[in-house]
A protein has these predicted regions:
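Iron-sulfur (Fe-S) cluster-binding segments and ferredoxin-like electron-carrier domains
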Residues: 27-31, 36, 47-97
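Nucleotide/phosphate-binding catalytic cleft detector across ATP-hydrolyzing
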Residues: 69-72, 76-218, 223, 272-273, ...
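Glycine-rich phosphate-binding loop of actin/hexokinase-like ATP-binding domains
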Residues: 219-223, 228-256, 320-335, 367, ...
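N-terminal phosphate-binding loop and adjacent alpha-helix
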Residues: 247-289, 415, 426-431, 518, ...
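Short glycine-rich phosphate-binding loop at a beta-alpha junction
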Residues: 295-306, 463, 541-551
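Short glycine/threonine-rich loop-to-helix capping motif typified by GTGT followed
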Residues: 306-320, 491, 539, 551-570, ...
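Catalytic phosphate/nucleotide-handling subdomain of diverse soluble enzymes
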Residues: 396-398, 539-603
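A contiguous, well-structured pocket-lining segment that forms one wall/lid of small-molecule binding clefts
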Residues: 467-537
């Protein structure tokens, strides 16, 4: 056995032990060291870079590591085997920097404005913002020698009088604390209950003097990023908000790689633990700590995610989603509880899931459609969710059609050498001077934060600016020379946005021709899906009245730059509306309102799903879209290089 030491830039270390021949990336996974590996460790992405600091590794040379970098000790973890005791540095850009949890500051109100807007819009349609949770206050008579009714019977009798319901369920967790709470409170209590037309379920019991908050948890499980809010179920107030990288990322950047991982022994449990134990539960604990709310006072949870993430969250085999005829285990489920899957809130908390529409159009898109309000407008609207599994909806109050395209993780920083989530250190906006070719950029974080990488909105800006200034051609190849443009010995070009001395990382922040090519394919998948769906309805882009854009690619997405690169159709900019993380906002609405929850089920049931792989023209559309902005320039009459 050999000792493997993983060192981090903050000075911390993790030690593990491995046998000769063990793969370094697998050793890291076993030690819960989060090294980014979007390609699931097959050497294709070049993201799992580590630096050899001591000892030896048996490493294959790769195009992702230059000869100079190799001499400095840089290796790909997935291409390295253990052969001796070894110490490696895991740089921030390759490690938990991408998946670092962030609890939002709600004091500015900017973080919660989008939830308030959605709540008001839904309420204007007549949907009531009421749910089935209530706090019931009871004053019971104390037992005597003449009144020896058991405590639980005394409680249910009082509740029955209050609610006039025959069936009242008191779970073991409440029964266990019932005798002490009743006597300490002199039989004056508050109960947190769920009331349906058929029965009542008692979640918790408190002394009547206590202030009781009924907590609710809404979670958007993205393939790359997980976001969550804790709310007051009585008022709808956002109490805490958090985001984190999905712990599953180390098993692959896309759903197919993760499904393949589940076919290995123990794979389903491993993927479920990665999203629940390593991602969601720590987010819950940190949010609860920040607002001084006990975790067991969260009594309801809503999850919105794509179909694969739904299955992996629930610990259900997703392998049948990737093979014909692409059948999921469920579209919706109402029988899941926190204790079933290990979510560390009240064990009896009911988990509702936004309903899936198809094998690759999931609950995230139905939740987002609820927020977009397409279903309540006569105008023709296009809803685009820019995520790893790019999903689209087109329609109005009379009809809606949906489809999904495998855009990959590029919009959230995956498949990009210096890509990252929209968190501290991410370049989220950029301009480039045509004459000097010098960049000016904006970085997420406090003033003075140094750049570490590029998030989705920053990538869009950089590629658009490179094209509009003539630094790259429509194929994404570098055609101008300058101090920030360089080529390696293979002839591969790159543009340096921030040199190492300007950056907050151990290497230059740059974008390469490989990165640009990956992004062109991602944007091509989205645009070709739009064209294919519209063509199937005999529509063209001129008939689109509004475009609603959602996704966690950075709040400052420049719509003109997105049009410049051919991601979005060339329509007037006033038609574009950025609605943020609509999946999370939709989950919030479903959590808060029983009627909104039912409306989401109705939307899913009435939406037509188009399977793009069965449309003969889709691949032709995709090939045409894999240029900047497109092979057919007439589709983008308003895009002109400066």
């Amino acid at each position: 056995m050999f000792k493997v030491t993983f060192a981090f830039e903050n000075g911390s270390e993790v030690e593990a032990f491995a046998n000769a021949g063990d793969n370094l990336l697998e050793v890291a996974r076993g030690a819960n060291v989060a090294i980014d590996a979007p390609c699931s460790g097959n050497g294709a992405c070049g993201k799992c870079r580590v630096q050899l600091k001591g000892g030896e590794l048996d490493s294959k040379k790769t195009l992702h590591i230059s000869d100079e970098e190799f001499e400095k000790g840089w290796r790909l973890a997935c291409m390295s085997k253990i052969c001796a005791d070894v110490e490696v540095l895991v740089p921030d850009i390759a490690s938990a920097y991408k998946s670092r949890m962030k609890v939002a500051d709600l004091s500015s109100k900017e973080e919660i404005a989008i939830f308030e807007k959605a709540k008001n819009q839904v309420e204007e349609t007549g949907i009531q913002l009421r749910n089935s949770l209530e706090v019931v206050e009871l004053q019971m008579t104390e037992p005597t020698l003449d009144d020896t009714m058991p405590d639980v019977e005394r409680l249910t009798r009082a509740l029955r009088k209050f609610m006039n319901l025959k069936r009242i369920r008191v779970p073991y967790a409440v029964l266990r604390k019932l005798p002490d709470v009743l006597r300490a409170s002199k039989f004056s209590v508050k109960c947190v209950v769920r009331v349906t037309p058929d029965d009542m379920f008692v979640y918790d019991i408190f002394d009547a003097k206590e202030d009781v908050i009924m907590g609710g948890l809404a979670v958007d499980i993205g393939t790359t990023t997980v976001s969550a809010v804790i709310i007051n179920m009585a008022t709808g107030e956002i109490l805490a908000k958090s985001s984190s990288g999905n712990g599953q990322i180390r098993y692959g950047a896309d759903v197919i790689n993760r499904i393949i991982e589940t076919t290995k022994p123990g794979g389903i449990k491993k993927l479920q633990d990665a999203v629940i134990k390593e991602t969601i539960n720590p987010m819950i604990h940190e949010m609860c700590r920040s607002i001084h709310l006990p975790e067991n006072q969260i009594y309801r949870m809503c999850v919105a995610s794509n179909t694969t993430m739904n299955h992996l969250f629930a610990g259900i085999n997703a392998d049948y989603l990737r093979t014909e005829p692409y059948i999921p285990a469920f579209f919706k489920t109402n029988s899941l509880f926190a204790s079933d899957v290990g979510i560390e809130i009240n064990g009896d908390a009911h988990i509702i899931m936004a309903p899936n529409i198809g094998s690759y159009v999931g609950g995230d898109i139905t939740a987002g459609t609820l927020v977009s309000m397409i279903w309540n407008r006569p105008e023709f609207s296009l809803f685009i969710d820019l995520g790893t599994n790019g999903e689209l909806v087109f329609g109005n109050s009379d009809f809606m059609m949906s489809c999904a395209c495998s855009a990959g993780p590029a919009f959230e920083g995956g498949d990009i050498s210096c890509g990252m989530r929209a968190t501290d250190g991410a370049i989220e906006a950029c301009t480039i001077d045509k004459e000097t070719m010098e960049p000016t950029y904006k970085v997420v974080g406090d003033p003075g934060t140094k750049p570490v990488g590029l998030c989705g909105s920053g990538i869009i800006d950089v590629i658009s600016e490179l094209f509009m200034t003539g630094i790259i051609n429509p194929k994404g190849k570098f055609v101008r020379e300058g101090k920030r443009v360089r080529h390696d010995h293979y002839g591969m070009g790159s543009y340096v946005i921030a040199f190492e001395e300007e950056a907050g990382s151990v290497k230059d922040v740059e974008i390469t021709e490989v990165d640009i090519d990956n992004f062109i394919r991602a944007k091509g998948a989205i645009f070709s899906a739009i064209r294919t769906m519209l063509s199937s309805l005999d529509f063209d882009v001129s008939m689109i009245d509004d475009v609603y854009v959602a996704g966690g690619i950075g709040s400052g997405i420049n719509m003109q730059n997105a049009v410049n690169i051919g991601l979005f159709p060339d329509v007037p900019l006033e038609k574009f509306h950025y609605i943020g993380n609509s999946s999370l906002t939709g989950a919030y609405l479903m959590l808060l309102s029983t009627q909104a929850e039912k409306k989401t089920y109705e939307l899913a049931a009435n939406m037509t799903y188009m399977e793009l792989s069965t449309v003969p023209t889709y691949m032709d559309e995709f090939v045409g879209a894999c240029f900047i902005p497109h092979t057919d320039a007439s589709m983008f009459p308003n895009v002109h290089q400066r």
